[in-house]
């Protein structure tokens, strides 16, 4: 169709964080890469060691600390590289590698959201539990979900995706929770404003070889940083 073919099976498992630490440069030094990747190898090795069958029970107020065995984890074993450079964040724009601060209106919405939730106890009813805990939408290494917008690594497991594409659609299926996100290209009608779905209503357009996706009608419980009107990403 004259555009890049995105189809295939992909993984976004990586040790590179979504956002860069404040004051950090865009590229890791080799010493920093060795430290990060070495720490992950050590974590995997420790988690793979056999447990002592003669160990005593955990303390009454303690945590068992093993909700999953190490075999299930797939955090990646290296940092992301762009043109051979080990990047310190997945965000490349803005240049500081961070999500811009909220606007005054965004900050007001955030306060309103948290003020509303604060009137309830954490376990008052299931709707107050996190979406990821309820296996509805899984959140990864940012306040966005694994399926977006924008898409971010889980930093745990199930980092695989299958992409299917034709002239009018790009379909992304996630291993995590087996969610499917459909990006429509060129369809004339958007959803009514009162119809708000998980992952929203995604519309794509090609700008050269870049697929730019505008997502609206985001479910009110799903928005990134309480933003549910429109998110543009590529």
What are these regions (language model features)?
Residues 1-234:
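PEST-like low-complexity, intrinsically disordered acidic/proline/serine-rich tracts
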């Amino acid at each position: 169709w004259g555009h890049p073919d995105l189809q295939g099976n992909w993984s976004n498992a990586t040790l590179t964080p979504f956002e860069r630490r404040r004051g950090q440069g865009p590229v890791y030094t080799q010493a920093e890469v060795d430290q990060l990747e070495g720490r992950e190898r050590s974590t995997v090795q420790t988690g793979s060691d056999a447990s002592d069958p003669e160990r005593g029970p955990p303390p009454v107020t303690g945590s068992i600390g093993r909700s999953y065995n190490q075999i299930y984890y797939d955090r990646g074993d290296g940092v992301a590289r762009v043109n051979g450079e080990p990047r310190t964040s997945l965000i490349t724009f803005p240049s500081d590698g961070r999500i811009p601060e909220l606007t005054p209106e965004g900050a007001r919405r955030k306060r309103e959201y948290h003020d509303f939730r604060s009137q309830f106890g954490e376990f008052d009813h299931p709707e107050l539990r996190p979406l990821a805990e309820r296996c509805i939408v899984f959140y990864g290494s940012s306040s966005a979900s694994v399926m977006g917008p924008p898409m971010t690594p889980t930093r745990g497991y199930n980092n695989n995706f299958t992409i299917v594409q034709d002239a009018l659609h790009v379909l992304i299926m996630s291993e995590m929770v087996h969610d499917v996100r459909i990006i429509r290209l060129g369809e004339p009608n958007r959803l009514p404003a009162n119809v708000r779905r998980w992952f929203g209503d995604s519309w794509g357009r090609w700008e050269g070889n870049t697929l730019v996706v505008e997502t609206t009608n985001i479910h009110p419980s799903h928005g990134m940083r309480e933003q549910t009107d429109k998110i543009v990403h590529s």
